[in-house]
């Protein structure tokens, strides 16, 4: 388990936590710590969308009895649901159920986006297939790299989600601008530092999504820092790790703030305000909002 520590907040309910966070100064660093709630983990939970279509996912259920948001996380190319396990767990400690899904890891990513849209529609209609405590009006989509493109495509295809969070997303071809122009839900883009870790066509997301999008880059972060498995990936002797835990924690804190913002306010403004000190300090840079 990463060494984040646990918040000193002790709300009795999700509503109490929500009230506290919305009535105090928004600060992304608060979310570097794990949240106050216990989490029940269900590995390899099978979602049966039809008699022929099944999706494997890991489910992280937050303890409160109230209805709560659902955050769905999608990996990128040549990656897996396990690469986002700690992010999903961390979100659930803050009162947001999480589902890390496994789709074909080599794409096609337009197809994965459409599968994601079908899955969200299915959950929206029948939340009890996961848990009766899911608030279907507060489903948030999160995707890393090409998974970020798939999230954008799902939103463009009309997935009934409250918004999306793109973790250092990469574009997937000439049709991306047309998909991006169709998005009418709020989006937060959390990018790595392009000086060290450029990805393909990241700039098109802010360029072509018409409105309701905000973007920040995390200084010195790599593309892999936008992932966060429960156990670090093995590395060759004498090589530097692809990801740094400190920067992974920075990513997960920004992700948690953005997910809370989208779920509980319907826009990115809470998260944007929470980033203000990090922007002033230069930890977050290349900031854009429209």
Predicted features and spans:
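Conserved hydrolase catalytic core segment
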Residues: 154-162
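The feature captures the conserved acid-bearing segment of alpha/beta-hydrolase catalytic domains
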Residues: 162-225
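Gly/Ser-rich "nucleophile elbow"/oxyanion-hole loop immediately N-terminal to the catalytic nucleophile
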Residues: 108-149
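Hydrolases whose catalytic domains are alpha/beta-hydrolase-1, hotdog thioesterase
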Residues: 150-155, 175
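Short beta-strand element of the alpha/beta-hydrolase
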Residues: 67-76
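Short amphipathic alpha-helix adjacent to the substrate-entry channel of hydrolases
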Residues: 82-102
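N-terminal cap/lid segment of alpha/beta-hydrolase-fold proteins
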Residues: 5-66
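Alpha/beta-hydrolase-fold serine-hydrolase catalytic core, especially in secreted/extracellular enzymes
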Residues: 229-290
